[in-house]
């Protein structure tokens, strides 16, 4: 399948598959709610933006910590139990500090916040590696697995917009302090959905090393990994800039347009075109962001960004799947997840580090989510986008065409 014309099998959309897709959406939405939640409360407590960036970035480190044990855990124990335990730990991470602060008036320092984000990332990474890379595959036939990976990745991708949108709705109609309890409830919802799916028992392998790259990281995909990280870092810097509700709604609209474009615009397009167009769209969004007109900043920019991120994400996922050898599908999807999340997290963290004075533009605790666009962050993003385009066009794509296996 060299094009994006992924076949649709109606019988794939059974009840268990729906449950896993929405579990993926709820879980990742609970995580992306913290894009606004963490800066808001840390700024309220007097932390500097660089400290906010470090706390946000710690998640990107955490997602790698338990990946090497994933293969052992899903074979030593029932794979759905591993996923459920991981999601449960994510839910606890969402609410534990909030609970101790609100009901026991226990304050935690910067180091504890960093450690908690690392732990959250570790269990979220394990949950994703078992859910999207293992359990989803177990619910479908072998000829449907590429389609299943493609669909479930889209549910996770939508969370980039649904998480911040939900926080804005909480802020508008309720109170920002409900952000973490709501994230906790979403994670519990994901846990319930996964628990409702029945999985057959699979006998473990005879020899199971405690640590391995299986279901964790695809070594032969390092060029793809680096390229994705650079692309998503440039896009991630946009999320370090304060935006209003309209922006995130338009970002969601851009992602929806990307789904439609993949089906009708890129269905029979050249293999290279999708990533190139996506990078051009991201670059255009960054360029238009320099404009001070409200329509351009609040509507056009997020639509272009969402469209670019959407078409790039789907194409690179398929690249990873085609690069994998026999029985490495789960490993390839996990590697894509790691690259995607690491890139976005690094971009957001770098954005906060670069805008150390951002919270001083408007007084008060709401400044972190109501500030105007900070143009200085766009220039490094544009440089990363240009570098990513050159890297993909002249190095990564020719390398991929030479090394793909499917």
Segments from the language model and where they lie:
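Central cavity-lining transmembrane alpha-helices of secondary-active solute carriers
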Residues: 54-73, 252-262
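A late C-terminal transmembrane helix in Major Facilitator Superfamily
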Residues: 324-367
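C-terminal ends and interior cores of transmembrane alpha-helices
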Residues: 88-107, 280-294
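Glycine-rich segments within core transmembrane alpha-helices of 12-TM secondary carriers
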Residues: 144-168, 336-349
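Cytoplasmic helix-loop-helix junction between adjacent transmembrane helices
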Residues: 116-155
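C-terminal transmembrane helical hairpin of 12-TM major facilitator-type secondary transporters
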Residues: 272-316
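Helix-loop boundary and gating motifs at the non-cytosolic
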Residues: 5-60, 220-250
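Symmetry-related core transmembrane helices of the 12-TM Major Facilitator Superfamily/SLC fold
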Residues: 177-196, 375-398
């Amino acid at each position: 399948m060299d094009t994006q014309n992924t076949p649709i099998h109606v019988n794939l959309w059974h009840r268990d598959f729906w449950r896993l897709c929405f579990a993926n959406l709820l879980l990742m939405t609970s995580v992306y709610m913290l894009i606004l939640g963490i800066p808001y409360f840390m700024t309220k407590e007097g932390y500097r933006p660089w400290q906010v960036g470090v706390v946000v970035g710690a998640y990107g480190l955490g997602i790698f910590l338990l990946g090497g044990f994933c293969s052992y855990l899903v074979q030593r124990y029932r794979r759905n139990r591993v996923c459920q335990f991981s999601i449960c730990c994510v839910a606890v991470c969402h609410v534990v500090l909030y609970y101790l602060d609100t009901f026991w008036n226990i304050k935690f320092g910067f180091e504890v916040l960093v450690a908690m984000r690392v732990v959250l990332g570790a269990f979220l990474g394990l949950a994703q590696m078992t859910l999207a890379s293992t359990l989803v595959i177990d619910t479908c036939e072998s000829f449907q697995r590429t389609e299943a990976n493609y669909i479930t990745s889209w549910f996770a991708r939508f969370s980039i917009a649904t998480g911040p949108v939900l926080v804005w709705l909480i802020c508008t109609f309720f109170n920002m302090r409900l952000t973490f309890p709501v994230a906790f409830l979403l994670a519990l919802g994901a846990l319930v959905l996964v628990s409702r799916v029945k999985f057959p028992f699979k006998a473990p392998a005879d020899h199971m090393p405690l640590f391995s790259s299986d279901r964790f990281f695809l070594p032969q995909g390092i060029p793809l990994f680096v390229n994705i990280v650079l692309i998503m870092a440039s896009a991630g810097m946009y999320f370090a800039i304060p935006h209003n509700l309209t922006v995130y709604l338009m970002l969601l609209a851009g992602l929806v347009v990307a789904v439609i474009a993949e089906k009708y615009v890129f269905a029979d397009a050249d293999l290279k075109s999708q990533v190139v167009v996506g990078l051009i769209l991201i670059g255009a969004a960054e360029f238009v962001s320099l404009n001070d007109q409200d329509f351009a900043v609040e509507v056009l920019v997020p639509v272009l960004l969402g469209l670019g991120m959407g078409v790039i994400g789907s194409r690179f996922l398929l690249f990873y799947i085609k690069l994998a050898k026999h029985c490495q599908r789960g490993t390839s999807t996990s590697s894509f997840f790691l690259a995607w999340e690491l890139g976005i997290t690094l971009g957001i963290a770098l954005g906060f580090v670069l805008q150390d004075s951002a919270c001083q533009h408007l007084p008060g605790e709401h400044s972190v989510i109501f500030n105007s666009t900070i143009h200085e962050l766009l220039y490094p993003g544009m440089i990363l986008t240009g570098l990513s385009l050159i890297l993909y066009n002249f190095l990564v794509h020719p390398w991929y065409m030479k090394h793909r296996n499917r």
